[in-house]
UniProtKB/Swiss-Prot annotation:
A lipid is attached at residue 18 (S-diacylglycerol cysteine). Keywords: Cell outer membrane, Lipoprotein, Membrane, Palmitate, Signal, Virulence. Pfam families: TbpB_A, TbpB_B_D, TbpB_C. Haemophilus acquires iron by extracting it from serum transferrin (TF) in its human host. Acts as a transferrin receptor and is required for transferrin utilization. Residues 32-50 have a biased composition (Polar residues). This is Transferrin-binding protein B. One of its GO terms (cellular component) is cell surface. The gene is tbpB. It comes from Haemophilus influenzae (strain 86-028NP).
Amino acid sequence: MKSVPLITGGLSFLLSACSGGGGSFDVDDVSNPSSSKPRYQDDTSSSRTKSNLEKLSIPSLGGGMKLVAQNLSGNKEPSFLNENGYISYFSSPSTIEDDVKNVKTENKIHTNPIGLEPNRALQDPNLQKYVYSGLYYIENWKDFSKLATEKKAYSGHYGYAFYYGNKTATDLPVSGVATYKGTWDFITATKYGQNYSLFSNARGQAYFRRSATRGDIDLENNSKNGDIGLISEFSADFGTKKLTGQLSYTKRKTDIQQYEKEKLYDIDAHIYSNRFRGKVTPTKSTSDEHPFTSEGTLEGGFYGPNAEELGGKFLARDKRVFGVFSAKETPETEKEKLSKETLIDGKLITFSTKTADATTSTTASTTADVKTDEKNFTTKDISSFGEADYLLIDNYPVPLFPEGDTDDFVTSKHHDIGNKTYKVEACCKNLSYVKFGMYYEDKEKKNTNQTGQYHQFLLGLRTPSSQIPVTGNVKYLGSWFGYIGDDKTSYSTTGNKQQDKNAPAEFDVNFDNKTLTGKLKRADSQNTVFNIEATFKNGSNAFEGKATANVVIDPKNTQATSKVNFTTTVNGAFYGPHATELGGYFTYNGNNPTATNSESSSTVPSPPNSPNARAAVVFGAKRQVEKTNK
């Protein structure tokens, strides 16, 4: 039997067979549908629609906004803050620092920047460990470059208000209340001639000529008098999925002024997996003392492996205030130790299809090959936002489908990120709580520093363990993306825009016995490529087992390719309410005792005929119900 990889419907894996191979394979098992078998359809009772989010509400590891300055020439129009000015991601924490320091050099400013450097290694160890927020700017900045041509002249501060997290939460409480306390910062719009009494440290500059900042308020700085600076406080009820809180400032105690902690905003948000979205509401709708008088849009998330911290941002509706905040669990919450479980998955498999020369046997080459294998076909955890609507590539949140009115079962799109163009393929439209797929640098886009690597991903919001069924046999049907090869030839499958042309994944789950069996098949012949057997413990939302391959890749190869036979560890989980979906992944890295086929398991021994076998697979499936005959 001769066939070709599944590269139809406009999608391309760009994995070609190696020398001597055509990319096809034979298997012993052939599955022929029978008309007497039950007919199934997706159980859509728990399906969700992708959230339609504005730019400010799109989840990311962090974000920020530039301070603004007042035009001192021409009509002296106000400088507002707006959503178009929001920076939704930073490629690294040093992005802000580098920009501010470059402007400092260009303007020949000799004073050091003000605020915390956006570099985790330099932070106070008493502050947050996983997410932090603040200001970073230079004073005495001027820009008169457009004075003659556009009658625009600016003078003030140059820099950013920002927050940045380095690890999104994976384990969260399923019930109970956690409290958090931390800090917040703000920047304001400007209006010529406008002053506010709260900004008493600014000598008439804040809001009049430039963005006001925390330094313009006479804040308490002595902890003996109470809380100091700007205070953020939160209460997260993980049972009701509600986040409430408040943002306050402190008045410094002096001979003529008493210490006072005054609330400026209330926070009300809904928790979505490890993110939250909602609003800030001012305590005053009008004020001559300050501009904190307008309701605003708020978005943020939980950070740290166990949601130990949170961070986020907000923008006032009147475009006069942008704020960032971060906080960590209070000592009371730490002592209470709420019961937590893994609810968020983010997995990334990285591999290259380059193979070594099978005839080379020198010690030097063998050593080099082993080192390459240690890094190839490996799986790692990545930050994920739970709802599986966005994939982080180089810290940029790439939207996954469905986007708009599309009937495509699998999507394939280009995304320009930094100096690279990535091809991102995602599956599947009928999956609401788990998404899988792959991405790679497009060879046709002249990317710089092209790695030649491929990346498979799996993202999902797991089923709480209390919602896993305890009885019943359930059928799950879905699809898979995968690569299998040896040192002579290879085969790959991704997806197709048409659902019935995708490589099928079929699973039977026995919730009584806590077992799962499955088959990953070819799209054209329905022949089985991988058999899966797994188990899961009572009260667990994850399964683990083995994936077995017993295939001949390109049997007509003139180099007499032998049958590839290996077994490796498969990991997966149930996703969505009441285990409505499932997904998983596995890799195989050959008969190499120093390599690891998954992040938590050692290499499974291979038969002598498969020392050069390699595989990488991700899959997902939807719970089925029998069709009603009419």
